[in-house]
């Protein structure tokens, strides 16, 4: 694995438990210190749900994807960026350098709309590999929020697993690890 990339998607449901979160941070720090090139894409569903409930907004889902209007995308973006910053700062506390990558800072994902009825839910259309590799070459861990920019720099929410698969495929990573509490079928990328 010395010169190989590993993409890790860590689900928001898994990271609710602070002990699990802290173990994840420790594991990432160890992998980085061992010289393994890792890219992390995180989820955030439970945190998004909590913030929407605080605003008395009921989520509607189609095919497992949250219907996302203009008001909801603003909340989703804020929650995912805050969570991203939490991961980066926790890694820094362990002495591991990481870089936030999201729609407001270092965006690497260009998107197209998934389906009109889903609103601002996108599908990755283009990944900026060069930017990710520049971070890795500095011995830092890129921490990527599942957000992308579409036409006119409109923010789109992306399913975390979909974002992780797109990044892994684009980078031709050796492994894609999906850390989740949801049963998944084996997916070939």
Set out the residue ranges of the language-model regions:
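Nucleotide/pyrophosphate-binding catalytic subdomain
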Residues: 1-187
